Amino acid sequence: IPIISDFECSFAAEDLEQIQEFSAGETKEFTMTMRGVKNTMITAPEGWSAKFSKEAGKENVLVVTAPASSAKMMTRATADNSTDIAILATSGKYAMIAKIQVSIKNRTDYKADFDHGKDITIGGITINNQIYSDADIQILDATDADVALDTYFSATMSKPVILFLTGTAHNFTTTGVKSISNDVIIIGRYDDEQVTLRPINCWKSCKGKLLFKNIKIDLSDLNGGSNAGYFINNAGVISKGDFTDICIDNCLIANVLKPIYYDAAQKTYFGIDNISVQDTRIEVNAIKIALINIYKGFNLGDYKTFNFKNNIVYSQTPQEGVQILNWATGNIPLSDGVLSAEIINNTFVNMIGSNIFFRYQKGTSLTISKNIFDVSPEAEFGSYYYSFLESCTPQIDVTDNIVYGLTKNWNYYHTSSLVKEPTSGNNITKH
């Protein structure tokens, strides 16, 4: 092909010699250098879309979209048709071909799944683009600098917010108290990277739900009093049932120094229907801490379900008095507890339940099953699975757990518990 100065079709970037990797369904733009071109023909692997932009001022931008799945059914001509996108440019008797190679990464892109109508499950709750057709949907990238999320929170949110986050070099941050008054869903976009969220002050639930998936939640700055003394509270839930769910799914909660959730213990504040933590690693670096702290909450009847499943809760050194969930005496409840709680398939390393792992007023059921508890033998404390502080008849299942370590006893229930199961005895055999 003759080389002439007024005819060119090429990719403007100089770093396109390697294969360009896409997530399933992802779209990327490539700027072309085009001179003297009269006609073009584009070929792409089966399932891929490649076309020039119709947006004004971007006529020389090639828009490439990967198929929604990684299945490859290639039938096209033009060299290696399983990876090549080729542009044949012509001008009279002259012709030129520009090519790039593309492939789909072997990873999940939750944003692409959402765009293509797939269900995303977070703590048993399904989200998709039909349920959230009116949401404010954002893709945010912390590759080059910290990204502030403050503008996505307010006490008067008119629509749900879904944030797909990517980039691990820097943090996503919030400063000051953040109010949640509609559904807020925060998802690490790619399943093979976990972005970091670092709040400076607490988040206040008002209405809706709060869902996390595939996020590292760094709580290092929440180690003070007042608004830095916990991560999430219910200080804005002023009507029964306004805030339905807090779900943390497939996350890392790092450097826990204060409660993850805290009930503000006011008669005018209501509870959260469902709290779920699953498939999550939790790094605890504090003694005598309740991860979910109902404190002296009044409206206990609003807490319906608590699910704590498939988590790893750990510390480098034994932490005394760690609680998974706690309600403290001191206020007379306005409604009795009806909580159904499941603590299943977890691993606890150096977490000592000397203040009782699960401590509540009344409940309908409690399952603590198929967990592993391992504490360094030098820890001189007893450890207790549960205590109900008022008389009730919940269904109790505290079976198939394995315990190691401690110089003192592992016990099913605290001696002050008004529910005592199993009736055959309180001591748990160590392994």
Each predicted region: which residue ranges?
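Extracellular beta-strand/beta-solenoid scaffold signature
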Residues: 175, 196-204, 220-239, 255-269, ...
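Low-complexity "stalk/linker" and mucin-like segments enriched in Ser/Thr/Pro/Ala/Gly
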Residues: 41-67
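A short beta-strand micro-motif common to beta-rich folds, especially ectodomain repeats
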Residues: 1, 72-93
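Acidic Gly/Asp/Thr-rich repetitive segments characteristic of extracellular carbohydrate-active
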Residues: 110-166, 171
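Extracellular beta-strand-rich solenoid/capping regions of secreted or surface-exposed proteins
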Residues: 68-69, 158, 171-186, 194-243
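Right-handed parallel beta-helix
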Residues: 183-185, 208-219, 242-255, 270-288, ...
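Acidic, glycine- and Ser/Thr-rich low-complexity intrinsically disordered tracts
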Residues: 115-120, 130, 390-431
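Solvent-exposed, low-complexity, repeat-rich "mucin-like" stalks and linkers
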Residues: 3-47
